[in-house]
């Protein structure tokens, strides 16, 4: 069962949350259709921005769209021009006030959707599929919160006449464990030989008592370039030695 079902759908309310937050009685079908149109518009219009996730929240007369992206500069544009254009288009699409919230994804190699998109870009650029898969797995396993990864490719791999499926994995990916935090993402590579489908599963530890193991293993925030208080300055030891010699 865990091998076939969508990992997010199986774990809704346990380790994963809904990607839309609203309630509707009579307009349920219209809201679902609007959500699909919003997601399709963002995926097609911002295909180079590395969109990892889109979360939609609705009130009576307002729609808030959270865009999780690896390249926020492309979404925002020069002086916010691109973000304003996207907001206007979404307002035309929904007929309501739209508030955009653009969030940057820090750990790109630990996000399943971004890993799948990266493999798809490499396949379009004629990189060997085994090399692309190996590179993605190595980059993901370097992240401290990643405990396992599985990548599956399906299609005319290497330009073969007959389509086939290839899979690589490293570490643990327990798809049957409900408390396991599994990140899942898909992408398509449009090559000269046809479409190649990419699926990625990333295991980031368990969720016990509402505490995510991935958050405990996440790397600490680094200091900024202007913060010099937490590190020794050059010549500090030489000054101390010179003072000791003068006192002696």
UniProtKB/Swiss-Prot annotation:
CDD domains the UniProt entry points to: KH-II_30S_S3
Pfam families: KH_2 (PF07650), Ribosomal_S3_C (PF00189)
Annotated GO MF terms: mRNA binding; rRNA binding; structural constituent of ribosome
Listed InterPro entries: KH_dom, KH_dom-like_a/b, KH_dom_type_2, KH_sf_prok-type, Ribosomal_S3_C_sf, Ribosomal_uS3_bac-typ, Ribosomal_uS3_C, Ribosomal_uS3_CS
SUPFAM superfamilies according to UniProt: Prokaryotic type KH domain (KH-domain type II), Ribosomal protein S3 C-terminal domain
Domain KH type-2: residue ranges: 38-106
GO cellular component labels: cytosolic small ribosomal subunit
GO terms (BP aspect): translation
PROSITE patterns documented for this protein: KH_TYPE_2, RIBOSOMAL_S3
Keywords, in A-Z order: Ribonucleoprotein, Ribosomal protein, RNA-binding, rRNA-binding
Biased composition (Basic residues): 231-242
Region (Disordered): 214-248
Entry annotated with the keyword RNA-binding: yes
Listed PANTHER family: 30S/40S RIBOSOMAL PROTEIN S3 (PTHR11760), SMALL RIBOSOMAL SUBUNIT PROTEIN US3C (PTHR11760:SF19)
Stated role: Binds the lower part of the 30S subunit head. Binds mRNA in the 70S ribosome, positioning it for translation.
Protein family: Belongs to the universal ribosomal protein uS3 family.
HAMAP family attached to this UniProt entry: Ribosomal_uS3_B
Oligomer and partners: Part of the 30S ribosomal subunit. Forms a tight complex with proteins S10 and S14.
Protein name: Small ribosomal subunit protein uS3
Organism in which the protein naturally occurs: Corynebacterium aurimucosum (strain ATCC 700975 / DSM 44827 / CIP 107346 / CN-1)
Primary gene name: rpsC
């Amino acid at each position: 069962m865990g091998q076939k079902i969508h990992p997010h759908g199986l774990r809704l309310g346990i380790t994963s949350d809904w990607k839309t937050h609203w309630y509707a009685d009579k307009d349920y079908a219209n809201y679902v259709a609007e959500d699909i149109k919003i997601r399709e518009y963002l995926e097609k219009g911002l295909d180079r921005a590395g969109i990892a996730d889109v979360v939609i929240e609705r009130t009576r007369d307002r729609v808030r769209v959270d865009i999780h992206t690896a390249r926020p500069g492309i979404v925002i544009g020069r002086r916010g021009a691109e973000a304003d254009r996207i907001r206007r288009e979404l307002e035309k699409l929904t007929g309501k006030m739209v508030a955009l919230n653009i969030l940057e994804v820090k750990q790109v190699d630990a996000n399943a959707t971004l890993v799948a998109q990266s493999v798809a870009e490499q396949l379009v650029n004629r990189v060997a599929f085994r090399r692309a898969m190996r590179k993605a797995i190595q980059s993901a396993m370097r992240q401290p919160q990643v405990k396992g990864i599985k990548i599956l490719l399906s299609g005319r791999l290497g330009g073969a006449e007959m389509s086939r499926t290839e899979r690589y994995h490293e570490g643990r990916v327990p798809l049957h464990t409900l408390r396991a935090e599994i990140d899942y993402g898909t992408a398509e590579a449009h090559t000269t030989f046809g479409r190649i489908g990419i699926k990625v599963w990333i295991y980031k530890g368990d969720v016990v008592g509402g505490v995510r193991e991935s958050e405990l293993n996440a790397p600490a925030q680094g200091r900024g370039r202007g913060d010099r208080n937490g590190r020794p300055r050059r010549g500090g030891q030489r000054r101390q030695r010179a003072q000791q010699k003068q006192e002696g």
